[in-house]
Amino acid sequence: MTRRDIFNQIMTTNRPPIFSDRTSVEQVEEGTQLAPKFDDKGVIPCITQHAETREILMFAFMNEEALRLTIGTRLAHYWSRSRQKLWKKGETSGMTQEVQRILIDDDQDCIIIEVTLTTPDAGGDEASCHVGYRSCFYREISGSGDDLPDLKFIESEKAFDPNAVYGDTPNPTQL
């Protein structure tokens, strides 16, 4: 089945590409069939990395539908735990993530997607973080021993203005 066939299947039916059943450790670890292991909440962790710079951009979760759509459309889709809904990256901001490669770990319970980015519709540089930084990992934990750790900014400037990009959209960060 070609990528175009898979894409057409996704766009014309609600059936996902066939994920194999997990039948043996050997099949999962050494086989060539995709048999992802979703957790008890129906999600799998996903690390998103820039395809060219190798920079870690973000961490999110995918449910089965998000993984199916990501594979089929080559655009990153995630499951938003805070909003409890499917989330196509860039739907609000215009900052889509175009998938170049998808990796899965040895026991098929964690995904890495390598992406290229687009710039926000409202202007600014390419980024992945809703706070405005290029990466969601824009701070480093510093301190040692018995000291209370501090957070040190490793990205000094925001890539875009989140107010201009998101407007009145509710902030997904929860306390």
Regions found by a protein language model. Name each.
Residues R3, F7, T12-V43, A51-E52, ...:
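C-terminal binding/interaction regions
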